[in-house]
Design a protein with these regions (language model features):
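Helix C-cap/helix->beta junction micro-motif
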Residues: 27, 82-83, 214
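Active-site pre-lysine segment of PLP-dependent enzymes
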Residues: 44-46, 70-82, 94-123
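Non-catalytic terminal extensions of PLP-dependent enzymes
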Residues: 194-197, 204-206, 213-215, 231-306
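PLP-dependent aspartate aminotransferase-fold enzymes
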Residues: 1-57, 77-78
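Active-site phosphate-binding strand-loop segment of PLP-dependent enzymes
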Residues: 42-91
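Active-site C-terminal subdomain of aminotransferase-like
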Residues: 103, 107-226, 231-236, 305-306
Length: 306
């Protein structure tokens, strides 16, 4: 409203989470999607072409969900600031991983600046109920200033019931998830999160190494943290159908989200997976052998359908 933008737009990569499109639909915003490059981060040249006088928000992901790589946040924030737009960093998956990863293994697991230390970043989201290890229903959004935060609040005093103020779409919510999240964070502390992050990324590193050692499948891009995908290796003489691999793993009790394009199996690795990792790695090898001779598998939906 302050810039008098009549038809506001969100500029985001095709790798940005689908929830942004849901939000745009709810609020009547237009989305302008830009492609990713060969390393699966946003194409900055295409994003520069997409931002303009109607841009209200530019999105960066730290990391993006499908391939698990971190967008160049500083460059994205600079593009947003150049047109007077906000820049939101989706760190729902990385907010409780990236800070501790940089402490544990700065060379191997570190990331370029992505948080509010980056000039031009105006807000960050981080999910406590993911790698914060809190129960479902707890997340945070951090605004750079109180001035920006006030736009989130709905304030109405034009009915007979008195003033109604709410900072979210859901209205009144249970305090239980917040209390549980507070308890988890207090219990784990810095040392606890460092230990959990080391376990999660250590397991993910073993998975990446094992997948890339099997002819016919690979891990795309250079994900350094706990998210990754498994895809068919099209450079192989015998590429494996990745959904057939998913079927073979499912038959052994391992169920993975299926995504695309490109067709892939998505893995979110947490510290809790470490105890079964050895068994999973053995089954991966057996499933790959089975998938070579199998008919193509089928995709599923990342959603809840009626």
């Amino acid at each position: 409203a302050e810039r008098s933008v009549a038809e506001p737009e969100i500029v985001l990569a095709e790798s940005a989470h689908a929830a942004f499109h849901k939000g745009a639909h709810l609020f009547g915003l237009r989305t302008r999607m830009v492609p990713v490059t060969d390393d699966w981060t946003v194409d900055l040249d295409a994003m520069a072409d997409a931002v303009g006088p109607n841009t209200a928000l530019v999105v960066a992901s730290a990391p993006q969900y499908p391939q698990g790589v971190v967008d160049p946040v500083a460059e994205i924030a600079e593009l947003a600031a150049g047109v007077g737009a906000s820049c939101h960093v989706d760190a729902c998956m990385g907010g409780f991983v990236l800070p501790f990863a940089s402490i544990e293994e700065p060379d191997a697991w570190g990331s370029p600046p992505w948080d509010l230390a980056v000039e031009g970043v105006t807000s960050i989201s981080a999910d406590l109920h993911k790698l914060g290890y809190a129960p479902k229903g707890a997340s945070v959004i951090l605004h750079r200033s109180r001035r920006l935060r006030r736009y989130q609040t709905f304030d109405f005093d034009g009915w007979l019931g008195g003033r109604y103020v709410t900072p979210n779409l859901q209205g009144t919510r249970s305090g239980l998830p917040m209390a549980a999240a507070w308890a988890v964070v207090r219990h784990l502390g810095m040392d606890g999160y460092r230990h959990l992050v080391r376990s999660a990324i250590g397991s993910a590193d073993r998975i990446r190494t094992a997948v890339r050692a099997i002819d016919g499948i690979t891990v795309p891009g250079d994900p350094r943290h706990h998210l990754l995908s498994i895809v068919s290796d099209t450079s192989s003489d015998e590429p494996i159908d990745v959904f057939a691999l998913g079927d073979a793993l499912a038959a052994r009790g391992w169920h993975h989200d299926r995504q695309g394009p490109p067709d892939g199996l998505h893995l979110t690795v947490s510290a809790g997976n470490a105890v079964v990792l050895g068994e999973w790695l053995e089954d991966l090898v057996a499933a790959a052998v089975e998938a070579r001779a199998a008919a193509p598998g089928s995709a599923t939906d990342y959603a809840t359908l009626e």
